[in-house]
UniProtKB/Swiss-Prot annotation:
Modification sites for Phosphohistidine: H609
NCBIfam families: PRK09450.1-1 (NF006977), PRK09450.1-2 (NF006978), PRK09450.1-4 (NF006979)
Transmembrane domains' residue ranges: none
Regulation of its function: The regulatory domain is involved in the regulation of cyclase activity by the carbon source. Activated by the PTS system, glucose-specific IIA component (CRR).
Gene Ontology cellular-component annotations: cytoplasm
MF GO annotations: adenylate cyclase activity; ATP binding
Name of the molecule in the record: Adenylate cyclase
Amino acid sequence: MYLYIETLKQRLDAINQLRVDRALAAMGPAFQQVYSLLPTLLHYHHPLMPGYLDGNVPKGICLYTPDETQRHYLNELELYRGMSVQDPPKGELPITGVYTMGSTSSVGQSCSSDLDIWVCHQSWLDSEERQLLQRKCSLLENWAASLGVEVSFFLIDENRFRHNESGSLGGEDCGSTQHILLLDEFYRTAVRLAGKRILWNMVPCDEEEHYDDYVMTLYAQGVLTPNEWLDLGGLSSLSAEEYFGASLWQLYKSIDSPYKAVLKTLLLEAYSWEYPNPRLLAKDIKQRLHDGEIVSFGLDPYCMMLERVTEYLTAIEDFTRLDLVRRCFYLKVCEKLSRERACVGWRRAVLSQLVSEWGWDEARLAMLDNRANWKIDQVREAHNELLDAMMQSYRNLIRFARRNNLSVSASPQDIGVLTRKLYAAFEALPGKVTLVNPQISPDLSEPNLTFIYVPPGRANRSGWYLYNRAPNIESIISHQPLEYNRYLNKLVAWAWFNGLLTSRTRLYIKGNGIVDLPKLQEMVADVSHHFPLRLPAPTPKALYSPCEIRHLAIIVNLEYDPTAAFRNQVVHFDFRKLDVFSFGENQNCLVGSVDLLYRNSWNEVRTLHFNGEQSMIEALKTILGKMHQDAAPPDSVEVFCYSQHLRGLIRTRVQQLVSECIELRLSSTRQETGRFKALRVSGQTWGLFFERLNVSVQKLENAIEFYGAISHNKLHGLSVQVETNHVKLPAVVDGFASEGIIQFFFEETQDENGFNIYILDESNRVEVYHHCEGSKEELVRDVSRFYSSSHDRFTYGSSFINFNLPQFYQIVKVDGREQVIPFRTKSIGNMPPANQDHDTPLLQQYFS
């Protein structure tokens, strides 16, 4: 037994050293420096070293002895900077070991690969010590980033996997969806930089079911010493639920980096195919280690993963995805075999052997090696192929779930995040801009883009067509358009967000008189200036929550501009009554079309189009409907206006209107419902009513309808009887009515059950509400607020409302006789009757 264990230790150490050497080979000096010094920086803690912070920061790695490179670094600090290095105290040190995991040291490591580092620590560290160690690791990440090396640290309690603890979707080890599978990946890819050897490798595969008992036997026999080994536990049996959750997580990752994740996704699919008796890849590698079969290029974990996936796809005769996964593997290795190299490294030798076995020709190699120059056609083809593969994996996963009657163990929150990200990335919806280049090609820019409009009645469907060439008849006719949409806004957004349209692109347009080149260039400049191409991926918190508009552009008069009719005409209007929504003698709306372009908190990009004189109303209702009442305000709201005339005025007015409506929408509360906004459009008045759950729009023909709508919204749901014809008014009201102003009369009911309202408009038309149970003060406040805002911001034609100050009265009895007094928040009995000389303004209280 002793000799067997010693032989295993020697094999382990040899393979570990091979992996360390491979990790450093062909990498730049910065990577080599970071990779070599990380153990030293974690073992020691000194102000002259990167990662230093005040406090009792845990330091010291068990069994650590500096190598030659690390000793040279320490000597330089002592010699040139006067640093006195003090070794941590003897005994069990807080850090059990430092390990890389993932593609590092495998054939899958490339010059752009990052480093995932597990810092395993003793379980006796308290929460403050763990926080300090985490902060130090964050500082070391920043130090590495300053050298151009991406490093991610993960603190791992040595008992984490024994206690079935899980991370969350915020990190690389993410999700309640992974536990044993995460340990499987660690065991097959880990490279020990410093600290204890990994105990799991010493337990034969046929003893896996009795892992703890076997380990205790080794300790009891004195074959192994407990404090020399990192023990994260055995690879117990896997549940179907864990496969399901882990596969969903891999699909989540594959959205942003499909070439990188497709191989892992298919490995999990292979595991599920073998369920309930899967052969975990880590166990396979360990078995070969114990048997002395150092195959697959030194038990390279990446090559062995490809080998297992190949075995699975061949067994189910899925040669389409097998070809795809081989291409993904080739691109991940990033060795361009079609180009001669003076030095043939081990990774190039491995890839050459595999490509020879696959029977690839030079043309295929050249095509793959030219990936950096792939343009939209190749990228879209690759995107569709990757999407098909991912959806096939998803369908197989669903079959697996049904076959095993799964009750998914992943937390509902995690599953919700995964599902929402899949939806945001892949769901095709009208107006949604599909992003086709998730790290497939670095540059999709086009030197020429042509937008062509086809009017109704032609052979081709009406709308806009986009071509990636200059408008040469021969070239246009002989090529399919890149994209089609009924509206120009969607095409410009698609070209911009997919990277085809850049500052260097020459633009051409055949707009059939609808849009000319200067207008197109202005729009492109506005969109590119206000919408950055790349944003951080949506956080799990954002995906937990309803999507919210983050960046919004309102594009006015792009495709239809009413002010174009002013050309060579004399237009009469009064600057004192200038209203862009109801302009001039004919009260024309100067907003003819509205396009919306917005990005939401899930990083979806959406477009919408509205046309005609009601386009502003429709666009407003749509924008506000997409903002739930508890949403955060958009980070930015921009108005792009492309009118030939009065551009600045229209843009300013639309900006004011949209900003005010957004504020009203997001500030409505349960305690203060019934806010409203009136808007005069083309001689007609519309009311926008802001309730907690929605925003409604109502056309208001006259003053009675208008104020009735306000009253209805304030008293909604109460017992209200309305009369409009043959109304018998109280004599005191009938005698008090006066044309030219709006009058509200409040009357207490005889049974003291609520109150009545009599509304007379400027023409003395009457509407009556009986037995109202709402608040008179709120009604007065809202009508007064409406008057104030309307007077400040709108100009209305004389045919609508004169907008003399609405008057509010209370009908009271004084000495047994009904009289009218001005309404106060607290009506005062026995107040002198109201002055009926309407040339003298009535005293009125405003509520703001």
